[in-house]
Structures are given as C-alpha cells and as structure tokens.
C-alpha cells in the first residue's frame, strides 16, 4: 500500500504465488480510494464472469462489512442506487469491473486507477483492438496522478506479461531475518529440506548459519521482513513473492504438492507458476532444477 500511494511510483507490478494476499491487496487499494481518496477506478479481470465473481464474492462483502466504507456504495437493489454488479458509484468516484476480452469495457470513460488482475490469463488481444493492458492504460492518460497496478502469477518464459513488466521494474524482493543469526535473505525453494519420503519433516534452512526453521519460526521471520529493491528505480515498483512466504501453506503441504507435481511436466509447470511464482521453461531436464538436499 505504501507503493500504491507513493506519487513517485507510476506503475506497481506484483508477481506473486498463491495464498500471499494478492486479492487482499487489490481490495485494499479499492477500499482506500472509496474511503480516503475518491477516484474513478477500473478493475480488469481475465473474463467478465471472473469480474462478476470478484464483485459478488470479494468486493461487495468488503464494502458492506467495513465500517468506514459501509453506506458509501448503495446496494444495487436500491431504487436510486445507480449501481450494478460491475459498476459501483460512490461520492467522488466509481469503480467499474470488466473482462480483458471486452474491447468496449476497456475503451470508455477516463480512469485514474487501473487494477489489472491475473494479467497472464489475458488474451493477446481484446477482440481486434490490441493488448488489453495497453488499452486499459490509455484510459488513465489524462490524469497526472494515475496509477497502474498489474498483479499475476506467471506462466511461460518469454510469454509472461507479469514477468516482462517485473523485469522493467526495480525488482523488489522480500528479505527476512534468520531468527538465530539475523542474516537477511530471500526465501528459496532450494533451502526447503526434508527427510526422504517424510514431507512432514520439512523445514526451512538458513542460508547463512544452517539453522532449521519450523513453520511458526518461519512465520515469525516473515513478519519481521522488509522489501529491498535490487535494480534502479525508473517509476515502476516491482514486487516478487512466492508461496514459501505464505502463512496459509505449511511447508509439509508444499513438499507434498511438489513431490506429486514433479511426476509430470504439466503438473510441475503449474506448481512452479502458482507456488514459486516463477515462469516455466520447457526443458527436458527441468526437474533437475528442483534438486533439494534431503536430510536424513
């Protein structure tokens, strides 16, 4: 949220795994602009059906249950609401929700805040109009304080919108301190270790001192972490975070998923994209990239 509200940052790019708060981040941005900094907003989902589902299942409950937002957006069923599932008006602004495959939804009124969710699932072109992200971006051209937010799990190397955007950013990674030696480090799958055929023994091993972190220890370390940029800032803030940081997924479950996924390239590809938040390269020896030291 600090990056979203920073006037020096033009674009925010979030390349992330599952269960690390991507959707909550988007909801927080919407809530902030509904309650504190009213603006016209556009939320782009891969399809209209996904936009409707996001509105009903996530956005509407937040607007209804958050005290500071309650009442700012009228119930669509009210006679004077002027609201629908995919278009909600509030004092000083509105939020529209569209599918990336809809040229008309991407080419109407000016928008200051553009939120593009799961951009790697967008089609190459919205009808015959061109790239959906660029169409949405053009909607914000008249605002000096515009903000473009792109969020996604990645897909294939060379064809991933989110990876390409991340490569143009300042490439921020989340560094956590070891609870024992305090060395700050990115969490890597190569440092997840377990006894052979015993996923329940999985732990994270500090790259500096070798101490083993169980899940509670890992959760505490993550809470003390901080983002660090690894490249020059040129107006685009990029964030990468994998499922290893998630407090919702025990490492034992992650190891079980990995052991099951590595049996076939297609399932390993999905695991790589969704858990590690990394793009997939079609290589016959891809499984070798995940060689993990197993402790006896």
Residue ranges and their predicted role:
Residues 1-296:
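Phosphate/NTP-binding elements of NTP-utilizing enzymes
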């Amino acid at each position: 949220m600090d990056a979203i509200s920073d006037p020096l940052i033009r674009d925010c790019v979030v390349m992330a795994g599952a269960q690390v708060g991507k959707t909550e981040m988007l909801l927080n941005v919407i809530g902030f602009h509904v309650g504190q900094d009213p603006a016209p907003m556009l939320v782009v989902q891969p399809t209209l059906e996904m936009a409707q589902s996001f509105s009903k299942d996530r956005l509407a409950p937040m607007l209804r249950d958050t005290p500071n937002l309650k009442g700012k957006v009228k119930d669509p069923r009210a006679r004077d609401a002027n609201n629908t599932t995919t278009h909600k008006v509030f004092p000083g602004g509105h939020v529209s929700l569209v599918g990336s495959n809809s040229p008309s939804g991407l080419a109407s009124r000016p928008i200051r805040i553009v939120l593009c969710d799961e951009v790697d699932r967008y089609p190459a072109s919205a009808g015959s109009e061109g790239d959906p992200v660029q169409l949405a971006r053009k909607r914000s051209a008249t605002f000096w304080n515009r903000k473009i937010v792109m969020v996604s799990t990645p897909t294939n190397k060379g064809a991933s919108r989110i990876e390409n955007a991340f490569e143009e950013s300042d490439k921020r990674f989340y560094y956590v301190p070891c609870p024992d030696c305090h060395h700050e480090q990115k969490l890597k799958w190569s440092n997840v270790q377990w006894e052979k055929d015993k996923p329940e023994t999985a732990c994270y091993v500090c790259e500096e001192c070798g101490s083993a972190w169980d899940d509670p220890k890992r959760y505490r370390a993550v809470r003390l972490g901080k983002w660090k940029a690894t490249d020059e800032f040129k107006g685009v803030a990029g964030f990468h975070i994998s499922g290893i940081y998630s407090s919702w997924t025990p490492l034992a479950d992650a190891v079980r998923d990995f052991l099951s996924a590595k049996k076939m390239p297609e399932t390993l590809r999905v695991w790589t994209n969704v858990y590690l938040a990394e793009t997939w390269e079609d290589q016959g020896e891809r499984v070798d990239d995940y060689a993990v030291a197993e402790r006896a």
